[in-house]
Amino acid sequence: MCGIAGVLSASFLPNGIEEILKQAGSAIAHRGPDDVGVWVDKDASIGFVHRRLSIIDLSPAGHQPMISATGRFVIIFNGEIYNHLDLREELEKSGRAPNWRGHADTESLLAAFECWGVEATLKKTVGMFAIALWDRQDRKLILARDRMGEKPLYYGFFGGLLAFGSELKALRKIPGFKGEINRDVLGLLMRHNYVPAPYSIYHDIAKLPPGTWLEFTPEILNRKEKPVPFVYWSAKEAALTGVADSYQFTSDTEAVNALEKTLKQSVSGQM
């Protein structure tokens, strides 16, 4: 488990943005006690903070925020990509792999985004994750969440400033945070015992739905638009496809064996 947070401005970043990001990171330090990283590009009016819990690559090569081999992309990422070695192998076979600096899944993810783009990479990726990706070339911020929404990702608009984070605690440290309770959501909280996406307990702060990604640019912030998430995976569509393509087992034993095989494959990919 790691923690991420960041801001994107339509004009200028607040004064002392590095310290603000450090405070946002400190608010979620329990998510990543091993390392902290801050990256700010004042010319692009964007800043990231990452709290790291080292799991796969324990070396400094896994430090975040991480910049891609070409320098085009900057990423902060919370979670784990279970098939990142498969992604590396596919990149290497295509001849488009970079010179690997380490063996972190973050680096694999960055190289995949650079090679295949956002949507194709998300569809190939198996894991639990919340991602913030800055495209320096197109001046575009991507926020993405895993298929089942295992890793949280909140975002909100504070004037001309977009802020996002793994937890609401991080957003409370951003200038302009109001903390006004969304009373319309209280009914959902009482009914489900949690606040479902795309809502949060606060006005003007949303939770990115599972299996989706968002694009933000300074122009979008200037127009005060609220972009609609792109869906790269849907549980409902997956279920309908499964029913349509269902295999007709000849016995209960055959069905049980097939289920056991599928579960073993799924669990082994996470070991």
Give each language-model segment a name.
Residues 1-271:
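Cysteine-centered catalytic environments shared across enzyme families
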